[in-house]
């Protein structure tokens, strides 16, 4: 199924995923497309931050859902 990931810059990334994919998997796909390391990614859906070990179906994320990607930058 397709889901969308919207970044803070307003860019929308389209990902091909399965309901059984973990949030880890999704972050890895985002890394493939955007080059953003998973440890800097925070994914938000319906106002909740998504935890790495959970699956998309745990959060009731269905096809064409939009997730929001927030970057967690290391404090310098």
UniProtKB/Swiss-Prot annotation:
GO annotations of cellular component type: cytoplasm; nucleus
Keyword Cytoplasm in record: yes
Gene3D superfamilies referenced in this protein's UniProt entry, alphabetically: Phosphatidylinositol 3-kinase Catalytic Subunit, Chain A, domain 1
Glycyl lysine isopeptide (Lys-Gly) (interchain with G-Cter in ubiquitin) crosslink site(s): 6, 11, 27, 29, 33, 48, 63
Keywords: Cytoplasm, Isopeptide bond, Nucleus, Ubl conjugation
Boundaries of every Ubiquitin-like domain copy: 1-76
InterPro entries assigned to the protein according to its UniProt record, in alphabetical order: Ubiquitin-like_dom, Ubiquitin-like_domsf, Ubiquitin_CS, Ubiquitin_dom, Ubiquitin_ubiquitin-like
Ranges that cross the membrane: none
PROSITE patterns, alphabetized: UBIQUITIN_1, UBIQUITIN_2
Location in or out of the cell: Cytoplasm; Nucleus
The keyword Cytoplasm belongs to this UniProt entry's keyword annotation: yes
Cross-link Glycyl lysine isopeptide (Gly-Lys) (interchain with K-? in acceptor proteins) placement: 76
Function as written in the Swiss-Prot or TrEMBL entry: Ubiquitin exists either covalently attached to another protein, or free (unanchored). When covalently bound, it is conjugated to target proteins via an isopeptide bond either as a monomer (monoubiquitin), a polymer linked via different Lys residues of the ubiquitin (polyubiquitin chains) or a linear polymer linked via the initiator Met of the ubiquitin (linear polyubiquitin chains).
Record-stated family: Belongs to the ubiquitin family.
PANTHER family listed in its UniProt record: UBIQUITIN
Protein name stated in the entry: Ubiquitin
Taxonomic lineage of the native organism: Eukaryota, Fungi, Dikarya, Basidiomycota, Agaricomycotina
């Amino acid at each position: 199924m397709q889901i969308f990931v919207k970044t803070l810059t307003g860019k929308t990334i389209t990902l091909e995923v399965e309901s059984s994919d973990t949030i880890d998997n999704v972050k890895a796909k985002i890394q493939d497309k955007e080059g953003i390391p998973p440890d800097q990614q925070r994914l938000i859906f319906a106002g909740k931050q998504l935890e790495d070990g959970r699956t998309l179906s745990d959060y009731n994320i269905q096809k064409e859902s939009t997730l929001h990607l927030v970057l967690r930058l290391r404090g310098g």
